């Protein structure tokens, strides 16, 4: 059993509707979507391989941001180690391979990826992108919105508490009295 090293990329571009992720159709298949990736050539790093594969497979230029994670998986009986990198879309390039590409939202990409490990890589990318844009990761947006709503309700309820008069004729809220 052989072991080989690959470089892969999660390429994203920011749109008004949020980040969109690049997926390419897997070689020799129909409607199986994957991240661009390929075998590390001699005298090449995994990051350089990932950049090359993005250009060759998808016809996209990208700017590396950081390494995401390494994934070990079995492919055609051999183990491969894939180092994934987060990359930002930087324009079009001339593709060397005839593959279909798709730019998908987080939810669409999760649905399109069939490997659990690829989904984990996408979740890591989404988390990092959301930190950089100030936007919450997709799966936490509802939870955060509910927390903000609950906080708003509590603050609103505190504002409705009756005020009491102090000896000097000024009013004090119950919040200040409880805190003081």
Regions found by a protein language model. Give the residues of each.
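N-terminal strand-loop-strand
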Residues: 1-35
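Feature targets compositionally biased, intrinsically disordered low-complexity regions
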Residues: 7, 17, 27, 76, ...
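Flexible domain-boundary/linker segments
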Residues: 26, 67, 71, 102, ...
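Charged phosphate-binding loop/patch that engages nucleotide di/tri-phosphates or the phosphate backbone
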Residues: 117-180
């Amino acid at each position: 059993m052989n072991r080989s090293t690959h470089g892969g990329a999660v390429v994203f571009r920011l749109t008004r509707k949020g980040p969109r992720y690049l997926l390419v159709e897997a070689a020799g298949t129909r409607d199986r979507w994957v991240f661009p990736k390929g075998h590390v050539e001699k005298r090449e790093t995994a990051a350089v391989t990932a950049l090359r594969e993005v250009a060759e497979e998808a016809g996209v230029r990208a700017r590396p941001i950081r390494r995401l994670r390494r994934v070990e998986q079995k492919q055609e009986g051999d183990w491969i180690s894939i180092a994934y990198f987060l990359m930002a879309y930087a324009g079009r390039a001339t593709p060397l391979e005839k593959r279909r590409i798709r730019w998908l939202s987080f939810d669409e990409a999760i649905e399109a990826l069939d490997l659990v490990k690829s989904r984990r890589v996408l979740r890591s990318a989404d988390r990092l992108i959301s930190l950089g844009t100030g936007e919450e990761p997709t799966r936490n947006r509802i939870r955060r919105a509910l927390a903000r709503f609950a906080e708003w309700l509590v603050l609103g309820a505190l504002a409705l508490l009756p005020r009491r008069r102090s000896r000097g004729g000024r009013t004090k809220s119950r919040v200040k009295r409880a805190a003081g």
